[in-house]
Amino acid sequence: MAWRRVLSQVARNRSAYAICNEIIYANPSRILRGDTIAGGTLRNLHERYQSSYVGSFARRMRQMDSPSEASLLKEIYRSDPERVIQIFESQPSLHSNPSALAEYVKALVRVDRLEDSTLLKTLQRGIAASAREEENLGSVSENLGSVSAFRSAGQVTKDGILGTANAPIHMVTAETGQFKEQLWRTFRSIALTFLLISGIGALIEDRGISKGLGLNEEVQPSMESNTKFSDVKGVDEAKAELEEIVHYLRDPKRFTRLGGKLPKGVLLVGPPGTGKTMLARAIAGEAGVPFFSCSGSEFEEMFVGVGARRVRDLFAAAKKRSPCIIFMDEIDAIGGSRNPKDQQYMKMTLNQLLVELDGFKQNEGIIVIAATNFPESLDKALVRPGRFDRHIVVPNPDVEGRRQILESHMSKVLKSDDVDLMIIARGTPGFSGADLANLVNVAALKAAMDGAKAVTMNDLEYAKDRIMMGSERKSAVISDESRKLTAYHEGGHALVAIHTEGAHPVHKATIVPRGMALGMVAQLPDKDETSVSRKQMLARLDVCMGGRVAEELIFGDSEVTSGASSDFQQATAVARAMVTKYGMSKQLGFVSYNYEDDGKSMSTETRLLIEKEVKCFVENAYNNAKNILIKHNKELHALANALLEHETLTGAQIKNILAQVNNKQQQEHAIEAPQKTPAVPSSPAASAAAAAAAAAAAAQQAAAKAKGEIAGIGS
């Protein structure tokens, strides 16, 4: 019944709407259609009827929803959206159906006629006019009813389905029942995307990336080397081995005449910084041939096959410029031992290198020189005879080599007359050429910061101590008790080292914090050592125990600190090596034991015996250090006081302090000897007690005097 009432009302409004339409648009008179009072009145009447016509059913749309008609339009929409538009516009009864209206809007969107629909614009104005009329009634209930009706029937229309000029509709329809079509569409999109990316990648690989990586450009040799063998110091044996390669590059016929063949590859082996790269440049400079330089890491990129291609290009360019030298630094980056688990592209580069080393003729004039710090990691096929079949060891320089290297670097800086490079060379055992170059550079920077005119010996000593012992932390806040304990601790180390046969000479003692240590005693050998004797190892154990013994003698057993933990670790390691590696234990004999495999290679009894021997070595060292410090107690006090005052003492200053203490003791004994009167013979025990008391009094007096006179030493 409600539907019929709405239809009748719509019919009445429609008749009025038709009359207005006929009067306004069918009348040929310009008066009615122009901008006159009559024309304006008729147009207002026309708009009012339009609003009444549309607004009358907009307020009752909730009651007029016909599912059957909307379903019919929905089915027709799938195949023919134009038909949906025609049906909706030709049947006014559907205008009050929200579902039908939604299908009509969808059809307009699909055929792209949303902006051209006059009926849709009329519906929008009618809904807006209806809302305004409901608001003017003033009734809360009618307002709620109007809003509810408008929301239920026109919520989608107001908020987005009908759209506006400022907020156009964006609609995506998902059709049901077409899963296979959607799946095929998705698969087709993915396939096309993959083909597109593959094509672009191939194009970039062929044109763009290859040019960017330099694969299409011919490999060019490095700049001509001006380095000569005379510039390389400290590796005389390695230079002698490489001279024959220089002779071959200068005069190949000299060797080929007698059928001689030079190695295809030369592998330079040695620690970092020993001058392997400099030797290769010296060969190129001496022979005067093109020099191709590369690094093992330069061959690999993110693209598979780039490494092998670069190897081919490198050797192809070298063949065009033979005789020449190819130098590969850090060859272990590509020449490491092959593993079945490695990626295929990693093997391709190494395989190509192996082929190139065997691929060119032996007398072609191409010498391949490689350098590595880890020869044991190289693939066996790479170092076999016929490839890198000659290994030249480039070790750290000896004392004479270090002096030559220092002279070479010091020739480039201003130095004072007091510089003695032999002293620096003796004090830098184990330094490589790069370390010595860094030492000279640090000294030059120190002199420049101080405003000096030339580099002095003190600058070189400062640089050496900074490299070997770490930078000073003078800003660290340390209590007086801690400084005093550190002074006696380091004094104990130094004193035991001085009075123990086989110990290295004391180079410097300091209580200035360096690195993580509060103080340290540096010992340097007089010359380079190739092996260590049993006496030297036992002396090293005694020196390690000197710090803890000094703490016990001066401060008591209850005041010892954890500062000796590193000393104990070092002593234990030396003692264990003497027992398990060097065969220096009479109990275990000349047997080597692997102590680092958790005891798997030895029995429990053997392990206990090893621990017993290690403990015996350490305890003997402790007793030796204790006897030395008790005997030289005055020297310990004098040395500790000097460290507290000056913080750092050199080996020569320490010897001067000890010599002054000994001289004072001798003078005191010489003065006291004539003053003694003949004593009445007494028992041996009484004589010994009297002698001990006299010695103790003399020791206290000498210590007091030494403490007052030590201030002028070490300045």
UniProtKB/Swiss-Prot annotation:
SMART domains xrefs? AAA (SM00382)
Q: Which GO terms describe its biological process?
A: protein import into chloroplast stroma; proteolysis
Q: Which residue stretches belong to region Disordered?
A: 665-685
Location of the active site: 490
Which controlled-vocabulary keywords does the entry list? ATP-binding, Hydrolase, Metal-binding, Metalloprotease, Mitochondrion, Nucleotide-binding, Protease, Transit peptide, Zinc
E.C. number, please? 3.4.24.-
Q: Which cofactor does it need?
A: Zn(2+)
Give one Pfam family. AAA
Per UniProt, the enzyme's principal EC class comes to: hydrolase
State its location(s). Mitochondrion
Binding of Zn(2+) occurs at 489, 493, 567
How and how many cofactors are bound, per the record note? Binds 1 zinc ion per subunit.
Could you point out where the transit peptide sits in the sequence?
A: 1-18
Single GO term (MF): ATP hydrolysis activity
GO CC, alphabetical: chloroplast; membrane; mitochondrion
Annotated ATP binding lies at 270-277
SUPFAM superfamilies assigned to the protein according to its UniProt record, in alphabetical order: FtsH protease domain-like, P-loop containing nucleoside triphosphate hydrolases
| Function (record text) | Probable ATP-dependent zinc metallopeptidase.
Per the similarity annotation, which family is this?
A: In the N-terminal section; belongs to the AAA ATPase family. In the C-terminal section; belongs to the peptidase M41 family.
Protein name (record): ATP-dependent zinc metalloprotease FTSH 5, mitochondrial
Q: Which organism is it from?
A: Oryza sativa subsp. japonica (Rice)
